[in-house]
Amino acid sequence: MCAERLGQFVTLALVFATLDPAQGTDSTNPPEGPQDRSSQQKGRLSLQNTAEIQHCLVNAGDVGCGVFECFENNSCEIQGLHGICMTFLHNAGKFDAQGKSFIKDALRCKAHALRHKFGCISRKCPAIREMVFQLQRECYLKHDLCSAAQENVGVIVEMIHFKDLLLHEPYVDLVNLLLTCGEDVKEAVTRSVQAQCEQSWGGLCSILSFCTSNIQRPPTAAPEHQPLADRAQLSRPHHRDTDHHLTANRGAKGERGSKSHPNAHARGRTGGQSAQGPSGSSEWEDEQSEYSDIRR
């Protein structure tokens, strides 16, 4: 129930977030105000923004956060790249040698890739956003984000702020990658985000965490039960065969009636008690009892 409602809420939010404001306007009545014209261009980067970003990228170097600042305040609303860069640089002194090397190499990788790929991509906002996030993921994985996070868990947790996850998609992408870096990193990041969420939203975070735990909870039926059931089904034909032999033997002995010796009945009971053993041994004992009755 929680998962269904949460899914409906997220779907509705995404629909409103991606809805084109210009959809449904009549082509014979173009918008007159500058706000209407800008709303029509939400789906693609304006020519002015494109020229400004390209000029900014040419002047920015690979070192520092200048390249990422070029993507702030544009019509595609790509926010957060510059903030992540500044956060890494401000906390670089808290990392060990491996972490510092990761920060330097990953930021340089992202800056170099953005500068060379931006001129080759479409001006459509979804294409630009996908290009930005794909390059970010590639650089994080190429320079081993998980190793740096595992050796610097405390610093990584300090860098993550709940409000950034609500406002900037690059932060969400970074946290999603961190959640794949082993149980220690995953637990620390989850605990930190949960605590910050409860400070901001209160009891709503507890409801969301309850829904998430229900979604991720494994099935109650243990997998070991199935092989036991299969073994029980396989053993039933054997028991039916054994019962059939015992019934036939008892019928044959009943027909002989008074001709049978009391010792023969004792041997028959002994054979019945050992029916759980191999069927060949039971049949051999029955044949011996019949031969004994004939001799008598």
Curated annotation (Swiss-Prot):
Residue spans of biased composition, Basic and acidic residues class: 240-258
Residue spans with biased composition (Low complexity)?
272-282
As for subcellular location, the record says:
Secreted
Q: How does it assemble?
A: Homodimer; disulfide-linked.
- Leader sequence segment: 1-24
Q: Name one GO cellular component term.
A: Golgi apparatus
Which Pfam families would you find in this protein's record? Stanniocalcin
Region labeled Disordered — which residues? Answer: 21-44, 218-296
Q: Which family does it belong to?
A: Belongs to the stanniocalcin family.
| Species in which this protein is naturally found | Mus musculus
Q: What is this protein called?
A: Stanniocalcin-2
Q: Which UniProt keywords apply?
A: Disulfide bond, Glycoprotein, Hormone, Secreted, Signal
Q: Which residues are glycosylated?
A: 73
Q: What does this protein do?
A: Has an anti-hypocalcemic action on calcium and phosphate homeostasis.
Q: What is the organism lineage in this UniProt record?
A: Eukaryota, Metazoa, Chordata, Craniata, Vertebrata
The Gene Ontology terms for molecular function here are: enzyme binding; heme binding; hormone activity; protein homodimerization activity
